[in-house]
């Protein structure tokens, strides 16, 4: 009986070849995979939502001028990490929606799965490991600067890509920089490398 699984696999492969499929190589691969799973030699792949949560390494470096704005006086700053189904509401919400307690949950609505808050201090290096359930498609980061520069107080990352590459960001006088991580836009589109302007501060003006 020990050879039964292998005879079963061979029979399935032969049947596929005799059937004369249009894409024999792709079909053979699929049939072989199914045959191995049915025979018990390999385990079938779990559905996405049944897989273990993602583990995303997040590295945050704060500047000596953290939250200084135009005043030049560094201050601590609140950072929030949002675990999201979608990025649309996250990017549409105004800055004030994140400042006022409870308004962020209202603004994000059903897109928000969970969030947490961290206090940043100047000239600090933080290395975190974020656990993202499989229902999370994006990880949003907001820093509540006193004088936020443009839209650079928030950024969202693709959860699946972030698990592979990790996320590396910097927090400065009034803006964030990104040196690693797939940044998502409002439509949920992203790329494996952050946009070039996200690693620059030259064109950022602190709001007064």
For the regions a language model picked out, list residue spans one by one.
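Bacterial N-terminal signal peptides that target proteins for export
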Residues: 1-10
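Bacterial Sec signal peptide processing site at the extreme N-terminus
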Residues: 15-43
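Non-catalytic, glycine-rich low-complexity segments
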Residues: 38-59
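A short, structured loop/turn motif at beta-sheet edges
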Residues: 50-52, 131-136, 161-164
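Short amphipathic, basic-aromatic surface patches that mediate peripheral association
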Residues: 58-70
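Short coil-to-beta strand junction motifs in C2/discoidin
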Residues: 71-80
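Mid-length scaffold segments of soluble, non-membrane domains
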Residues: 81-152
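Glycine-rich, aromatic-bearing surface loops/beta-hairpins
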Residues: 155-159, 163-208
């Amino acid at each position: 009986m020990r050879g039964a699984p292998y005879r079963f696999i061979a029979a399935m492969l032969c049947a596929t070849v005799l059937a004369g499929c249009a894409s024999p190589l792709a079909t053979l691969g699929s049939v072989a995979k199914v045959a191995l799973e049915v025979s018990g030699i390999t385990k079938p792949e779990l559905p996405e939502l049944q897989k273990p949560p993602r583990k995303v390494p997040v590295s945050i470096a704060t500047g000596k001028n953290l939250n200084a704005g135009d005043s030049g006086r560094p201050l601590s700053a609140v950072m929030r990490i949002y675990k999201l189904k979608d990025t649309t509401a996250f990017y549409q919400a105004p800055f004030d929606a994140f400042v006022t307690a409870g308004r962020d949950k209202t603004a994000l609505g059903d897109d928000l799965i969970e969030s947490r808050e961290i206090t940043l201090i100047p000239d600090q290096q933080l290395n975190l490991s974020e656990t993202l359930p499989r229902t999370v498609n994006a990880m949003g980061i907001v820093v509540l600067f006193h004088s936020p520069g443009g839209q650079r107080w928030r950024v969202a990352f693709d959860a699946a890509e972030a698990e592979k590459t990790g996320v590396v960001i910097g927090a400065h006088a009034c803006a964030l920089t990104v040196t690693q991580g797939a940044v998502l836009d409002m439509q949920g589109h992203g790329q494996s490398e952050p946009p070039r302007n996200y690693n620059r501060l030259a064109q950022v003006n602190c709001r007064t």
